[in-house]
Amino acid sequence: MKKISMVIVAISAMISLSGCHEDPTYVDSYFQRQSVIEELSNELKGQYCSIFIPVIYNASQEQLDYKSLWKGEVTENGQPIIHYTFGGYENRTVTLQQVPICWISFVIKDTKLAEAVKLLPDYDISIPYSFASSDEETGEASKMGKIIYSDSKVPVTLNYGGKQHLVLFNFKCPSQFVFDADKRPISSGRIQLELKSIIVDNVIVQEIDGYSGEEFFLSIMSKTDPISK
């Protein structure tokens, strides 16, 4: 009788323990599948052009007259046009071509650094992109997705103050574009770059947060159809 009681207790304990354990729920995200990532990124691959809208203010809230400084292609009303390239699956980055980062000098407080930055040529800025579900709370393979643009850092070497310095322009890219994978072709959406900080020789010398007056935004409007594939 004692042995039977011990067996019953043991079985009860096992049932109790198994009841406390739940199998993890696997969320099948459509946008985690390699075949989907490859298909979407290769669909975006190509050269594009779009209206380019800079919003640049210094600490005195003076706005940069970018239209008079822009040397590239423009629309009929003088709005700058920027060219950019989407890499495909093997290179999931979008590259903004010939960005006038010399305009950053307008918001820099250090006059010597500002003068050096003003002399910089145009640079290409590369921004990594990825795909994710826009409906991650559900356990369904939703085809509503979003393009996520990552941050980008632009390093330059400058000589000023009698020394050579490594300067890093730290851009945030908060853009996320929601799309339906069943509706093709997908669009890249608006891409926005925000200059958040300037780093010289691994030291942050200026943060651009809007509270002190300086603002540096570059907005590239959405363009659906590529110039070339």
Regions found by a protein language model. Give the residues of each.
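Glycine-rich, aromatic-bearing surface loops/beta-hairpins
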Residues: 149-229
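Positively charged n-region of N-terminal signal peptides that target proteins for export
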Residues: 1-4
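Predominantly extracellular/secreted and cell-surface proteins with exposed
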Residues: 79-174
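Extended beta-sheet lipid-handling architectures
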Residues: 48-50, 65-69, 99-101, 108, ...
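Short, solvent-exposed loop/hinge segments that bridge or flank secondary-structure elements
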Residues: 26-39, 47-99, 206-216
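Bacterial Sec-dependent N-terminal signal peptides
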Residues: 13-42, 219-229
